[in-house]
A protein has these predicted regions:
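Peripheral (often C-terminal) accessory segments that flank ATP-dependent C-N-forming ligase machineries
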Residues: 1, 5-12, 365-366, 375-443
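Short, flexible loop/turn elements at secondary-structure junctions
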Residues: 59-64, 74-76, 114, 168, ...
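Conserved N-proximal alpha/beta basic substrate-recognition cap immediately N-terminal to
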Residues: 93, 116-136, 143-291
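Short solvent-exposed loop/turn micro-motifs enriched in small/polar/acidic residues
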Residues: 51-54, 132, 182, 353-356
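Low-complexity, highly charged intrinsically disordered N-terminal segments
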Residues: 1-40, 50, 56-57, 63-65, ...
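Conserved metal-phosphate-binding beta-hairpin within the catalytic cores
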Residues: 51-76, 298, 345, 357-366, ...
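N-terminal beta-alpha lobe that positions the nucleotide/phosphoryl donor
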Residues: 38-42, 57, 76, 109, ...
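Phosphate-binding site of ATP-dependent enzymes
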Residues: 66, 272-294, 301-306, 312-395
């Protein structure tokens, strides 16, 4: 995840919603408040049919007239950005999540990303391990990086020490062999590594429970599969509440067989961009939105905000210069982009001081455990705020996403956060459906 600064305690605020056109959103938030018993009952019935991912984070965008998820991460890397006040929520949710997957588990091995230079990411691992330890687990951190050949203490952000131990495969189990601390044979393995570079042999065919499952990694997962599942969820939820599905659901298209270096697939991309922009214009006219429609073109597989661009015209993808093509051609781990998703762009009209803000909601099992705002002073309201090399300031949510004030204004802080929690849980449910559909054991 891109570098960030740690939450400052004096920032006890909620971003301003700087748009005059907030009628549709206030109506949506009011529908959620009025329908809260119905919504919570609906979620409970859904979780009887689907197993929630162990953990997830959802990036949302609030345009004042639309509130929608734009990305769902099944290997969240920002636990360091959550408010310490929500730790009890996290611990309770972690207890439930562990009990469901491995009820007898008391030892848990966390396998983080291989990179060890991002001190903020390392602090995320420290905080994640702390949550799980407080949930009653014996937790150690094991690395599958070839660079970690002996127990190594790294310094995480804030000077926090993090002990990484090399993982050893013994038969079909992963273990830590440590003369000083004793050997460690865990009941379950928690991946905080999104497998962008592929599934390493050391993780294949293990006896231990592996969470999330291997097919949740970006070597097999596709954003388009997720948003296809989200289409189904959003449609059913919108019928339940009697709202326009578009208010919570971004349109999307896909293009396969793209090669940005060779410039193959450009015509497909330009055509899909044009078609999507035309669809968005119709909805903008319906709701009186005067902003210019835009789409986001991004790699269908991958994370870290790489391989992403904002597009407002088909010509934007036909006239890419070499620098732009190079930027779009590869994602994390240097992998080539061959498939893209073209997603309706959702403006963010939330701001803090001089920065554009977008909410990120964190969940464990099917519980919302908190969240934060990415606040970016150098990007626009139509740009991706999660990008390599960018510096965003996390602003921890000061209110939980589970306790609306039904007597208050629809856009009062608890109610806005409740709406965030609802839409994030819709994306979580879509991820659960997606994982079930893509599970190789079900094929």
């Amino acid at each position: 995840m891109p570098q960030s600064t740690i939450v400052k305690e004096e920032k006890q605020m909620v971003p301003r919603l700087t748009t005059a056109l907030n009628g549709p959103l206030l109506s949506l938030e009011k529908s959620m408040l009025d329908g809260m018993p119905k919504i919570e009952h609906w979620f409970r019935t859904k979780w009887l049919d689907y197993s929630a991912p162990f953990y997830a984070s959802v990036d949302l965008r609030n345009a004042g007239f639309k509130l929608a998820p734009v990305d769902t991460n099944l290997f969240p890397g920002g636990f360091n950005n959550l408010s310490a006040e929500f730790l009890p929520l996290s611990v309770q949710a972690a207890m439930v999540a562990v009990e469901k997957i491995c009820p007898e588990a008391h030892r848990l091995l966390i396998i983080p990303e291989n990179h060890t230079r991002n001190t903020y990411y390392l602090r995320n691992v420290v905080e994640l391990a702390n949550i799980l330890r407080q949930a009653g687990m014996n937790v150690r951190i094991g690395s599958i990086s070839p660079e970690i050949t002996e127990p190594t203490i790294l310094e995480a952000q804030g000077g926090m020490p993090l002990l990484l131990e090399p993982v050893v495969r013994v038969g079909n189990r992963l273990k830590l062999l440590n003369k000083d601390l004793g050997d460690f044979d865990s009941c379950a393995i928690l991946l905080n590594n999104d497998l962008s570079a592929g599934i390493p042999d050391i993780l294949k065919n293990l006896e231990q429970d592996l969470i999330p499952p291997l097919h949740a990694g970006w070597s097999t997962r596709r954003k388009s599969q997720h948003f296809a599942a989200y289409n189904k969820v959003a449609q059913e939820f919108s019928e339940l509440l009697g709202i326009d599905e578009w208010l919570i659901n971004p349109y999307f298209e896909t293009c396969g067989e793209i090669d940005f270096h060779a410039r193959t697939g450009e015509d497909c991309l330009a055509l899909k961009v044009e078609q999507l922009l035309d669809k968005i214009k119709i909805k903008y006219a319906e709701y009186g939105v005067t902003q210019e429609p835009f789409v986001i073109v991004k790699a269908d597989a991958g994370t870290y905000g790489m391989g992403i661009m904002t597009v407002k015209s088909p010509d934007d993808v036909r006239d890419l210069n070499r620098k732009a093509r190079n930027k779009m051609a590869v994602v994390k781990e240097g992998l080539q982009v061959s498939e893209v998703i073209i997603q309706e762009g959702v403006y963010t009209f939330e701001s803090v001081d001089d920065g554009v803000a977008e909410p990120v909601v964190y969940m464990m099992d099917h519980f919302v455990i908190g969240g934060f705002y990415r606040v970016h002073t150098e990007r626009g309201m139509d740009e991706n705020l999660n990008a390599p090399g960018s510096h965003f300031s996390p602003l921890a949510f000061q209110k939980p996403c589970t306790l609306p004030d039904c007597a208050g204004d629809p856009d009062a802080a608890p109610n806005r956060f409740y709406a965030y929690g609802v839409v994030a849980r819709l994306a979580l449910l879509a991820a659960a459906m997606e994982l079930q559909e893509q599970d190789p054991l079900n094929s």
